[in-house]
């Protein structure tokens, strides 16, 4: 018996030792703000203790330590305390800072560490970059899979074809986690904006309205149409509510909420509070079959955690589920360790001592855990070589619309780490939602956009016009119907003092109409409260004005030149004439002192002016001019007249061939500078606000709009403005009033006017346009915009424009019946050069005349010899008598007449005694001459001769001696000087038959006949 006892004692001791080692002690560290981690951990240990399939006789004990959030020092202290108690593994659920500190400790002590990362404040988590172990042995295992949100978001924006969007994140989110996403988005050419959201979300939106202008808010609203929210569910709900309340969100906005942890009730809250489309990305776990929903690997899970009807599961966070599966993974490893009988006893470790050695069973326990494979609440869990759990799956939910249930959520696709995206994220075409719908349309009568076509009693009004045609084309393409009615006040929409809106805009804001269409322009103020489609027609402001009446002028031939030019030309004619007269008088005085010549044709004032006028009209009339001064004067005058006549001809041709409306007002600048005509627009209209904004802008350098606004806003607009466009058109037709309004409207009024009495001028350049107004946040805006662009591409809009604004209508705006010459009269400054040329010529002529007078007077005084006297007629008579006395017996003069020319002879000195004149009756020779300035009649002498007498001189009645001019005495002394201003005086001799002249003339005489 004793021998049997001794033989069984070692076995009994071994069994006792195994039973003692079968008590499994686990340490746990949680943050104090995670109360559910503690409860779930205890629930997991309780479930495993009751499961005999995993641990038959083994019992799990645990020690839990609670630390502050993000306190690594406290985490290390509590972990050392647990190691002193002796633990087989450490399970933690903390942030990244505490996890890094615990990793270093567990790596040094060889204690397996199962780490579950928590979401910071419910915000999306970012990856924890754990420090690698120096010896390459990492004892920390990440139970929760790495963050894959960047991959999901990149695939999502790619599927949605976003090119520009904004990402909002809160203070709890580590923006460094987006670095990889931003790098990939940059390579794809995406425009990504980041904006941090403070905890006081209402303050964020309030600051936007205080720091941004209206244009900036409109751009910010466009940015919000595509947004990704990296916020907590509560933060996202508050953010969307503020965006909707401040009218920064619209029905065509698309919100993408990305967070691994969000419950179904939270999703529904987001969907119902948001305007537009909502997409939610969250992590999901595979659901088990109904008969196995509470069983995982033969492990019975508490119904609180596996039965959705209990409701407790919906309240758990993802970190709680991974914490439960981490305990299950440890229990599975302990079970396999016990089966393999490779159990290592727990050891008390003192991490403060330097001599403390790590647990020798840590490596074996770590390998067993890493080889484990379980299926828990989160699905499959196992660890790869990098100590991470790779299995993760995401669900992508999207909003749906229905007539019965309104807005709801449906599953669009899933994403997992192995297969990627499974499903389609493309938005369902919105056009299908309009099929069969009836929209309420509000409008305002405005020709030719909207007009009443028929008005039958008892039936709704029928409308026609350009905007109605566009609406019909959209209804046909999209398959919807519409009911149209007029705005009660007949206005487009203007913000009142109480911040409310009237007109069509007010109808949209109050939800009484789905859309508004007419000649409504897209303005920043209107776009802040309603949405607009793409413009279907450009907009500009024009001036409707009455055409000027036709003016007939019989003096239009004077139009090519300005009055000052005509005055200068009229003054130049007598000035030049007087100068020519003076020059001729000077020349005549000089000539009288020598020969007393006959006055020239320009010696009188009226004759000189007549010569000038003849040259001006290019008809001649001037006598021969030999003086240098006269030639300079006439040359300058001829050049002057050539330029003047050529310019007159060219400009007159321009006046006759180029003609258009001669209206003094052609631009807004012309309108602002005149005061004879009043002008205005419709009060409280878009045009009214346009001039107000331009006229009151201190940065506007052009003062034109400021002057226009002063006139338009006089007396609050009551003096010059009208209440409706039709009133303004009627007022412009009456005359003396310019109506400023949309070019499209006033052009139609001018084209269809019965009298064609008005025209449109002064188009302004504007970036505005006519669009379709919809309720703020309407989901149909993009659909209408797309169809409008299609109508533009196909040319259908151009066809509709030609229908209502024909190029050849009743009135032609390109030509006018009252067209007048549009050329410009040449001003005096344009002719200053030619008048300068004339003045220089006249001055030069005066100078030359003075020099010529001085030169000739001095030269004649010095060079005239005493013996070189000009013979007069008496000398000729005496010479002829002497010749006849000497040779009368045998010299005869031919019966032909003898003409003596080239004898411009001056008289002798008054004191000289003349020889008596002898008569030769028998020769019957007649001598005739004309003496200028001495007498007004001719003097003749007759010499008689016998009929048989002959003169052997080569003279005949038909022969004329050439005229001669001499300034020096000839060698034979027979030539006389002739004054350059005197004309040759012919002398005729009529011989009588029987007269005999001497046979030859004495060459010694100084008279030539």
Swiss-Prot record:
Family annotation (SUPFAM superfamilies): Periplasmic binding protein-like I, Periplasmic binding protein-like II
GO CC terms of this entry: AMPA glutamate receptor complex; dendritic spine; extracellular exosome; GABA-ergic synapse; glutamatergic synapse; plasma membrane; postsynaptic density membrane; postsynaptic membrane
Broad class of the protein's primary localization: membrane
Binding-site list for Ca(2+) 1: 527, 530-531
Cleaved signal peptide residues: 1-20
Glycosylation sites: 131, 200, 422, 498
Annotated binding of Ca(2+) 2, by residue: 753, 755, 757
A GO molecular-function annotation: identical protein binding
Protein family: Belongs to the glutamate-gated ion channel (TC 1.A.10.1) family. GRID1 subfamily.
Subunit structure: Homodimer. Interacts (via extracellular N-terminal domain) with CBLN1 (via C1q domain), and more weakly with CBLN2; the interactions mediate the trans-synaptic adhesion complexes also with neurexins and are required for ligand-gated cation channel activity.
Protein name as it appears in the record: Glutamate receptor ionotropic, delta-1
Gene symbol of the encoding locus: GRID1
């Amino acid at each position: 018996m004793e021998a049997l006892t001794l033989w069984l004692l070692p076995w009994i001791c071994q069994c006792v030792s195994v039973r003692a080692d079968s008590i499994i002690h686990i340490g746990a560290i949680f943050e104090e703000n995670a109360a559910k981690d503690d409860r779930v951990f205890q629930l997991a240990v309780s479930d495993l203790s009751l499961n005999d399939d995993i641990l038959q006789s083994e019992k799990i004990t645990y020690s839990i330590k609670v630390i502050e959030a993000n306190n690594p020092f406290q985490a290390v202290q509590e972990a050392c305390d647990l190691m002193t108690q002796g633990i087989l593994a450490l399970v933690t659920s903390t942030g990244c800072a505490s996890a890094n500190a615990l990793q270093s400790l567990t790596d040094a002590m060889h204690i397996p560490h199962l780490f579950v990362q928590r979401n910071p404040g419910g915000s999306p988590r970012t990856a924890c970059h754990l420090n690698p172990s120096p010896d390459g042995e990492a004892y920390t295992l990440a139970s929760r899979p790495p963050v894959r949100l960047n991959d999901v978001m990149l695939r999502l924006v790619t599927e949605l074809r976003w090119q520009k969007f904004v990402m909002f994140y809160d203070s709890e989110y580590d923006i460094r986690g987006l670095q990889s996403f931003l790098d990939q988005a940059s390579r794809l050419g995406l425009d990504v904006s980041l904006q941090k959201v403070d905890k006081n979300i209402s303050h964020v939106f309030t600051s936007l309205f205080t720091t941004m202008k209206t244009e900036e808010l409109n751009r910010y609203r466009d940015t919000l149409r595509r947004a990704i929210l990296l916020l907590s569910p509560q933060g996202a709900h508050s953010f969307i509510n503020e965006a909707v309340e401040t009218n920064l969100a619209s029905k065509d906005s698309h919100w993408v909420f990305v967070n691994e942890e969000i419950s179904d009730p939270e999703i529904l809250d987001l969907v119902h509070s948001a305007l537009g489309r909502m997409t939610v990305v969250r992590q999901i776990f595979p659901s088990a079959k109904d008969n196995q929903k509470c069983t995982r690997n033969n492990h019975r899970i508490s119904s609180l955690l596996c039965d959705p009807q209990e409701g407790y599961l919906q309240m758990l966070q993802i970190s709680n589920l991974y914490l439960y599966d981490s305990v299950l993974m440890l229990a599975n490893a302990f079970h396999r360790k016990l089966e393999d009988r490779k159990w290592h006893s727990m050891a008390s470790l003192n991490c403060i001592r330097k001599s403390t050695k790590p647990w020798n069973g840590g490596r074996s326990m770590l390998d067993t855990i890493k080889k484990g494979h379980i299926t828990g609440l989160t699905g499959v869990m196992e660890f790869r070589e990098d100590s991470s759990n790779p299995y993760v799956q995401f669900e992508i939910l999207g909003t749906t619309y229905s007539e019965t249930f309104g807005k709801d959520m449906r599953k669009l696709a899933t994403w997992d780490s192995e297969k990627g995206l499974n499903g389609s994220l493309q938005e369902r075409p919105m056009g299908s939602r309009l099929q069969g719908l009836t929209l309420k349309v509000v409008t305002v009568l405005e020709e030719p956009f909207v007009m009443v076509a028929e008005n039958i009693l008892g039936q709704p009004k029928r409308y026609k016009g350009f905007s109605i045609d566009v609406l019909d084309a959209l209804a046909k393409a999209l398959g919807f119907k519409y009911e149209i009615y007029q705005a009660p006040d007949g206005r487009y929409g203007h913000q009142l003092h109480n911040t409310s809106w009237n007109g069509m805009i007010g109808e949209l804001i109050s939800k009484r109409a789905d859309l508004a269409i007419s000649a409504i322009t897209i303005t920043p103020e209107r776009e802040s409260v309603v949405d607009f489609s793409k413009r279907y027609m450009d907009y500009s402001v024009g001036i409707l004005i009455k055409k000027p009446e036709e003016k007939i002028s019989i003096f239009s031939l004077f139009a090519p030149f300005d009055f000052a030019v005509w005055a200068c030309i009229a003054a130049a004619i007598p000035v030049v004439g007087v100068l020519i007269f003076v020059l001729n008088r000077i020349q005549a005085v000089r000539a009288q002192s020598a020969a007393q010549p006959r006055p020239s044709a320009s010696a009188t004032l009226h004759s000189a002016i007549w010569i000038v006028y003849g040259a001006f009209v290019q008809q001649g009339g001037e006598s021969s001019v030999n003086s240098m001064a006269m030639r300079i004067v006439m040359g300058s005058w001829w050049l002057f007249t050539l330029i003047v006549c050529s310019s007159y001809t060219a400009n007159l041709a321009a006046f006759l061939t180029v003609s258009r409306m001669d209206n003094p007002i052609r631009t807004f600048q012309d309108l602002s500078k005149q005061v004879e005509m009043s002008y205005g627009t419709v009060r409280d209209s878009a045009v009214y606000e346009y001039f107000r904004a331009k006229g009151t802008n201190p940065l506007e350098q052009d003062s034109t709009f400021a002057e226009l606004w002063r006139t338009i806003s006089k007396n609050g607009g009551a003096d010059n403005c009208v209440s409706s466009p039709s009133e303004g058109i009627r007022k412009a037709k009456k005359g003396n009033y310019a109506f400023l309004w949309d070019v499209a409207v006033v052009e139609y009024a001018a084209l269809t006017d019965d009298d064609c009495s008005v025209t449109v001028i002064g188009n302004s350049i504007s970036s505005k346009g006519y669009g379709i107004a919809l309720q703020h946040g309407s989901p149909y805006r993009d659909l209408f915009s797309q169809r409008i662009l299609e109508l533009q591409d196909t040319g259908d809009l151009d066809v509709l424009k030609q229908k209502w604004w024909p190029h050849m209508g009743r009135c032609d705006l390109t030509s006018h019946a009252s067209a007048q010459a549009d050329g410009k009269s040449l001003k005096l400054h344009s002719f200053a050069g030619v008048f300068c040329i004339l003045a220089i010529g006249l001055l030069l002529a005066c100078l030359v005349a003075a020099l010529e007078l001085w030169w000739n007077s001095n030269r004649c005084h010095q060079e005239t010899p005493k013996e070189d006297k000009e013979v007069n007629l008496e000398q000729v008579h005496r010479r002829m008598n002497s010749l006849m006395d000497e040779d009368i017996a045998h010299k005869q003069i031919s019966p032909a007449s003898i003409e003596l020319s080239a004898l411009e002879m001056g008289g002798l000195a008054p004191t000289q005694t003349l020889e008596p004149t002898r008569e030769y009756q028998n020769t019957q020779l007649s001598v005739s001459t004309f003496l200028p300035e001495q007498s007004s009649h001719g003097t003749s002498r007759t010499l008689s001769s016998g009929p048989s007498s002959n003169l052997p001189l080569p003279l005949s009645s038909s022969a004329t001696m050439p005229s001669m001019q001499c300034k020096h005495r000839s060698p034979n002394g027979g030539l006389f000087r002739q004054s350059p201003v005197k004309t040759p005086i012919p002398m005729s001799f009529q011989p009588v038959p029987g007269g005999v002249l001497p046979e030859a003339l004495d060459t010694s005489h100084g008279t030539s006949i």
